[in-house]
Amino acid sequence: MSISSKIRPTPRKPSRMATDHSFKMKKFYADPFAISSISLAIVSWVIAIGGSISSASTNESFPRFTWWGIVYQFLIICSLMLFYCFDLVDHYRIFITTSIAVAFVYNTNSATNLVYADGPKKAAASAGVILLSIINLIWILYYGGDNASPTNRWIDSFSIKGIRPSPLENSLHRARRRGNRNTTPYQNNVYNDAIRDSGYATQFDGYPQQQPSHTNYVSSTALAGFENTQPNTSEAVNLHLNTLQQRINSASNAKETNDNSNNQTNTNIGNTFDTDFSNGNTETTMGDTLGLYSDIGDDNFIYKAKALYPYDADDDDAYEISFEQNEILQVSDIEGRWWKARRANGETGIIPSNYVQLIDGPEEMHR
């Protein structure tokens, strides 16, 4: 049975952000930017509609298309108030931005026709549409930007509800949490540095980040084989493995002089650990490596780990050891997905790292 079929994923209760979308005027009052900008828009709209009605009633030539622009602006103002009262601004940001952009074109076109027309009443109408154009431009800057943008953060800082959550930062944090579950600590550091350098992983309180329970704990959701199919061919690794190979050979020779039967058993074990930079001795097996580690004293098993789940060793793999849930194991190496460990009865072997958790002190043994 493969190790991947034994993985016991930690049950997670799906979290759901509850949002009240009922109609409440206090949601509109809680945003100073909405109150101030919409209030100025209403005043400007009243000036524009008043000047237009006065100009049209005195038999002065008035551009007919301006009427539709004024009505369209009124619909935009009413829609914005409803979106704030139902707390749906973030859900309709694209619609709001495009609609305001159309209103900006209508108002600037009307301002061009009214400014150069004769008559004092048309001047009042032109002043109203110019003010509406300025307000529309501010709205486009605000609603067209992400909530993580500097301008939006500064504007939302005056709101009672605080800074709005950013969909962009939300997606980045979800990707970061997925990376924390599926990558090694070194890969996580590289990914976190890239996100931090991009400028988006700043202060974000809307979605909590997943923090590891222990700095030395390595979790893996997809256990691969123990063999190294694509070894690193760097000089440092080459030197390290050659040194390890020599230690294994010397230990094997010592065991051969002491116990010929044990040496015969070890040389018959399969799964030869041979890489591109070995010294050519392919008779050394991982069984000898585990035999070498079984002679290590207690001082070298400097870590203690608590079993999160029970684990049954694979019968086809002579290197694995079984353990029970909540059992305390001594660990000598915490690098990689498989750790070298020893049970209380002296049995030594390898264990999957995502089945155990490192413990710091005696108080954690009883949790």
UniProtKB/Swiss-Prot annotation:
Q: Where is the composition biased (Low complexity)?
A: 259-272
SMART domains attached here? Answer: SH3
Q: Which residues lie on this side of the membrane: Cytoplasmic?
A: 1-32, 87-93, 144-367
Q: Which InterPro entries match?
A: SH3-like_dom_sf, SH3_domain, Sho1_SH3
Span-the-membrane segments of this chain are: 33-53, 66-86, 94-114, 123-143
Which coarse location class describes where this protein primarily resides? membrane
Looking up CDD domains in the UniProt record yields: SH3_Sho1p
List the GO biological process terms: establishment of cell polarity; mitotic cytokinetic process; osmosensory signaling pathway; osmosensory signaling pathway via Sho1 osmosensor; regulation of actin filament polymerization; signal transduction involved in filamentous growth
Task: List each coiled-coil range.
Answer: none
Q: Which UniProt keywords apply?
A: Cell membrane, Cell projection, Glycoprotein, Membrane, Phosphoprotein, SH3 domain, Stress response, Transmembrane, Transmembrane helix
Could you tell me which SUPFAM superfamilies the record lists for this protein? Answer: SH3-domain (SSF50044)
Query: What are the GO cellular component annotations?
Result: cell periphery; cellular bud; cellular bud neck; endoplasmic reticulum; HICS complex; mating projection tip; membrane; plasma membrane
| Region spans: Disordered | 252-276
Attached carbohydrates are found at 59
Q: Which PROSITE patterns match?
A: SH3 (PS50002)
Task: Give a single Pfam family match.
Answer: SH3_1
For membrane topology, the record states: Multi-pass membrane protein
Name all SH3 domain ranges. 300-361
Extracellular side: which ranges?
A: 54-65, 115-122
Q: Which residues carry this modification: Phosphoserine?
A: 166
Q: Which family does it belong to?
A: Belongs to the SHO1 family.
Q: What does this protein do?
A: Plasma membrane osmosensor that activates the high osmolarity glycerol (HOG) MAPK signaling pathway in response to high osmolarity. Detects changes in external osmolarity and activates PBS2 through the stimulation of STE11 and targets PBS2 to the plasma membrane. PBS2 activation leads to changes in glycerol production that helps to balance the intracellular and external osmotic pressures. Activates also HOG1 in response to heat stress and mediates resistance to oxidative stress. Involved in the regulation of the mating pathway. May be a receptor that feeds into the pseudohyphal growth pathway.
Q: How does it assemble?
A: Forms homooligomers. Interacts (via the SH3 domain) with PBS2. Interacts with FUS1, STE11, STE50 and RNA polymerase II.
What further fact does the record state?
A: Present with 2330 molecules/cell in log phase SD medium.
Name of protein? High osmolarity signaling protein SHO1
From the UniProt record, report the name of the gene that encodes this protein. SHO1
